[in-house]
Swiss-Prot record:
Entries under NCBIfam families matching the protein: eno (TIGR01060)
Source species taxonomy: Bacteria, Pseudomonadati, Pseudomonadota, Gammaproteobacteria, Vibrionales
Residues annotated as the enzyme's active site: 209 (proton donor), 343 (proton acceptor)
Annotated metabolic or biological route of this protein: Carbohydrate degradation; glycolysis; pyruvate from D-glyceraldehyde 3-phosphate: step 4/5
Family membership noted in the UniProt record: Belongs to the enolase family.
Name of the molecule in the record: Enolase
Subcellular location: Cytoplasm; Secreted; Cell surface
Binding residue positions for Mg(2+): 246, 291, 318
Length: 433
């Protein structure tokens, strides 16, 4: 009953108004899985390729008809008749057929959409929720946990049209006892932040990931207004709510000069100086996680950052590792960072994503499941976080349906699993157990 009978691709629209790939996989017995590929704005140079048409007369060159053609043509031809339950074989067929190092022939957007749709169809054929099927694929059947959310409530960098250089300022509702309570706490802080910003005369328009995107005097001020909002919501900063940042430092690194140029603050830093700048913020605020604190190619700087901060806080590699086991293995060997951000469109298939999570966990690194800035209503990452018991999730703020869809799916899953999926809070964050 799990034999593939049809594979279908279509062009749909993401949360930024750009096209993306949606795929359907149909099985014998009428089971169907449907999934859509997300899309990033601040992308690592070593990510798998997102195939775009380049026809400027259509969607400003961002159409995905070539990727759709691959889904409806070569990929469909290769997968019809195959067993959807064998996810590793399905993904291997597509990767081999593509034949490139970075999935540039079919596009990671095409391969991923089919990969995820296949997993959903297989789960349906087994009569189980996706998270349960993912746990089985992961070799951890029946082992679940609810992830601690990192909620991006102030957006800067490539995710907003403002003067804030650091891309994401996040809160983690660590005082919550359940995922549902964590979502409530996040929403309360978010609404109080709106009031704090308005009281200071700041704009409360939101960025790509649903966080506010005001022009601020400094990056430290972003943390200060969040601290005010946490207090106004009736919570204790550092006890009930902790802070996290995604610097996305590759976006303000001047490669030629070898400096970090924070135009919003009018400051420049060497790697070492920027590491000490971050260490200063960690001293001043209860920041427990920093992502991409340096440029993706600045491995010497990352080694210094890990020595300086790695035993105190979680240091997450996103552009640094791009969900790629080859790059992660090198990072583990060299003692670079202590956590990996997991974005399945960076690598382009579910099987390879699960391999990256396993490699990280086996090495004592944490794995943070993440959305992209260009999202859809697809909430697969919620099931991925629970099904791998990854422990942490980044899926934006408390506004925009493309973000909230993931929180709502997590609430549903928690309700279904009850005590089988504990919410471990701060214990999930590297260095905070």
């Amino acid at each position: 009953m799990s034999k593939i009978v049809k594979v279908l691709g279509r062009e749909i629209i993401d949360s930024r108004g750009n096209p993306t790939v949606e795929a359907e996989v149909h099985l014998e017995g009428g089971f169907v899985g449907m999934a859509a590929a997300p899309s990033g704005a601040s992308t690592g140079s070593r990510e798998a390729l997102e195939l775009r048409d380049g026809d400027k007369a259509r969607f400003l060159g961002k159409g995905v008809l070539k990727a759709i053609e691959a889904v409806n043509g070569a990929i469909a031809d290769a997968l019809v008749g195959k067993d959807a339950k064998d996810q590793a074989a399905i993904d291997a067929i597509m990767i081999e057929l593509d034949g490139t190092e970075n999935k540039s022939k079919f596009g990671a957007n095409a391969i991923l959409a089919v990969s995820l749709a296949n997993a959903k169809a297989a789960a349906a054929s087994k009569g189980m929720p996706l998270y349960e099927h993912i746990a089985e694929l992961n070799g951890t059947a029946g082992q679940f946990s609810m992830p601690l959310p990192m909620m991006n409530i102030i957006n800067g960098g490539e995710h907003a049209d403002n003067n804030v250089d650091i891309q994401e300022f996040m809160i983690q509702p660590v005082g919550a006892k359940t995922l549902k309570e964590a979502v409530r706490m996040g929403a309360e802080v978010f609404h109080n932040l709106a009031k704090v910003l308005k009281s200071k005369g700041y704009n409360t328009a939101v960025g790509d990931e649903g966080g506010f995107a005001p022009n601020l005097k400094s990056n430290a001020e972003a943390l200060e207004v969040i601290a005010e909002a946490v207090a106004a919501a009736g919570y204790v900063l550092g006890k009930d709510v902790t802070l996290a940042m995604d610097c996305a430092a590759s976006e303000f690194f001047d490669k030629e000069a070898g400096i970090y140029n924070m135009k919003g603050e009018g400051k420049t830093f060497t790697s070492e100086e920027f590491n000490h700048y971050l260490a200063g913020l960690v001293e001043q605020f209860p920041i427990v996680s920093i992502e991409d604190g340096l440029d993706e190619s600045d491995w010497a700087g990352f080694a210094h950052q890990t020595q300086l901060l790695g035993d105190k806080i979680q240091l997450v590699g996103d552009d640094l590792f791009v969900t790629n086991t080859k790059i992660l293995a090198e990072g583990i060997e060299k003692g670079i960072a202590n956590s990996i951000l997991i974005k399945f469109n960076q690598i382009g298939s579910l099987t390879e994503t699960l391999a990256a999570i396993k490699m990280a966990k086996d090495a004592g690194y944490t794995a943070v499941i993440s959305h992209r800035s260009g999202e859809t209503e697809d909430a697969t990452i919620a099931d991925l976080a629970v099904g791998t018991a990854a422990g942490q999730i980044k899926t934006g703020s408390m506004s925009r349906s493309d973000r909230v869809a993931k929180y709502n799916q997590l609430i549903r899953i928690e309700e279904a699993l009850g005590e089988r999926a504990p919410f471990n809070g701060l214990k999930e964050v590297k260095g905070q157990a």
